[in-house]
Amino acid sequence: MTLRGSAAWKQVGSIAQLPLGKSTNQHKNNHAVRSLSQQPCSSDRLKSPWLLSVRGVSAEAEGMRSLYETIMSERDKKMAENKELLLSVMETSPTRRGAKKWLKDFAPALGRKWQPRGISTAGPLPQADTRALEDNLPQVAIVKLREPQSIDETTLKGVGRTLCQLQMLGLLSIVVVDCDQDLVKGDALWPVIMKQTERALAGATIAPLARPRVMDYVMGIRPGSEGDQASSLAAGGVFVSREEPLIRALKDDAIVVVPTYAVSTDTCAARTVQADEVVVALTRYYSGLQFPNKSSGGPADTCQQPTAKPKAGIRKVMIIDPLGGPPANNRPEGAHVFLNMIQEYDTAMKYIKEADYPELKIASSAIGSTSDTSAHIRKKHADNLELTKRIVTLLPSSASVVITTPEEAANLRGEKGEESHNFGFLAQTRTRKPKNALIHNLITDRPAFSSSLPTTRFAASKPQAVKTGTMGNMDWTSKPIVTQSRTTLAKRGMPLTILPDPFTSPWTPTAPGQPRLRLTDICVDLPRLVHLIDDSFDRKLDVQDYLNRVEDSLAGIIIVGEYEGGAILTWEAPNPHNIPAAEAYAEAYRQGRLVPYLDKFAVLKRAQGEGGIADIVFNAMIRTCFPKGVCWRSRKDNPVNKWYAERSRGFRKLDDSNWSMFWTTEWDDHSNADYEDVCRKIQPSWADNKQIVD
């Protein structure tokens, strides 16, 4: 189309029409052509105007073809990226409640991002719900990228692609480059910071809409704060000194890369600072907790300025670390799936300091001996956990911290390290990628896996067995591929109350006639507990009948938060001969046959699916209260049965009843007979008197 309208094309067309002219002109032109053909060819002859025109057409056509191929290549690349993003979003499988929450928080930001530019003759677009949290502020995530010098180019670009996908979903990233000053020190640190900042910038440039930019010299540091001890609210003297570039980047929907150095307010000299202090300073700034101090040039104490004006809504803080999340004692070679910081911080920190790390390797060559390596790993895990505590203290309870590895952030886990063999058709048969942990968490506000799932149920944690075989003339061996996830989601969480305290005295059956916990004790808020049960089951509890039933069998209760969730557990006596309940309990106690039983498991409707309350209750029950096992029952048509089945060792439907029985103990015919007897004979205590249906 363009070539036909060009001057070169018209000139070639006129030359091609010369033989069709008048006879006189035809004779002259033929003579000219004959004369030209009879003369020896030379470079000067080849430079005739019409030949140059033909060559111009060829060059222009080649340029257009190259441009077309480039455009098509970019289009295919863009379509592939959009497809990958769409699949990542669809694989999250959010609940209706989670999807509505994500749309409420991020739809206004997406509406601004994709607002059409220029004049449009179409009708007005439907208005998105602008009643987002924090007055419709832009939503940002502060990302700490630790030790980028140990991350290869493919993984770094994958991390950049994920950050660009988060940007497309409405979450801007502020990337803090942490070159790990414990590994690189002295004069060698500055060039490493510069180089790794450039690599992080290049990795984030993978998508055109990312528009990443480096924000150097935006951080300041108070004079004389080199030895300051940073608290949970302070940032060790580091603060945002230049706001305008950061605000402009927010308006431009740009990804920001921040190197870890700050300018002293008294000497104007730049010096390196700890990345954790930069993360805390940025968190305070965007949250509106940094206030100007005219006397010192730095930020004032937050208690002097109670009014806060946030610049953005910080939804997530992400720590991308080659080590991944903090190790968990119940997941060998794996990390905590979910951390309820109020409840689990102390125990997690204690395990970090006591655990051995023989399987982990540091990519940096700066560490030599094994003891130094273990100490370094402990320190980095402890630093990440301490930073997480400081962040969740600053931010609202809805915010969270995600700690993951570069491979999982890039969604490359399971791909690297696998040998590729050309087996024809079989070579094209691939397993599906695991869920992108960061995208899944953004949409669902949950970890990729439930923290209450047994370790063997983690799909990503099942190593493939070593296989050997022959295909064609080739012998092959597939090495075991360990794809255990090392991603941790941490939130401020809720306090956990267990009565009686199992850390003081483990739960054991109470002897007949001895004092025991009762639901009417002053330590139990019975009205709140009854409301929790009524709301969760959507039925009214017959309170007095229930109190009478569990009066002599109560083992303990678990309460999360302000009675947002909880469980009531009992010691039940099997009674195959239908003797009086007191006699059955005494006999079972003497024989050691009392059954640990989950009597009530409840979560408020408004809290169901949020904050991992059900996981917190279930974990407390099976790991702390009844570590040797527990059983319970549920109606056969209960939609929660799938959730129960995934967390139990076994289940069975009881014949001639409407109950399914679940247990977490080892299989034993004798014990399971007792379990079945208990599950069949316990009478429900509902005020509607509809228990006959069960």
From Swiss-Prot:
Presequence boundaries: 1-56
Highest taxon of source: Eukaryota
UniProt region (Disordered), positions on chain: 20-44
GO biological process: L-arginine biosynthetic process; ornithine biosynthetic process
Locations listed in the record: Mitochondrion
Alphabetized GO MF terms: L-glutamate N-acetyltransferase activity
Major location category of this protein: mitochondrion
Keyword entries, A-Z: Acyltransferase, Amino-acid biosynthesis, Mitochondrion, Transferase, Transit peptide
Cellular component GO terms, alphabetical: mitochondrial matrix
Catalytic activity: L-glutamate + acetyl-CoA = N-acetyl-L-glutamate + CoA + H(+)
Pathway: Amino-acid biosynthesis; L-arginine biosynthesis; N(2)-acetyl-L-ornithine from L-glutamate: step 1/4
Keyword Mitochondrion appears in the UniProt entry: yes
Family assignment from sequence similarity: Belongs to the acetyltransferase family.
Task of the protein: N-acetylglutamate synthase involved in arginine biosynthesis.
PANTHER family xrefs: AMINO-ACID ACETYLTRANSFERASE, MITOCHONDRIAL, N-ACETYLGLUTAMATE SYNTHASE
Protein name per its UniProtKB record: Amino-acid acetyltransferase, mitochondrial
Source organism phylogeny: Eukaryota, Fungi, Dikarya, Ascomycota, Pezizomycotina
Gene name in the database record: ARG2
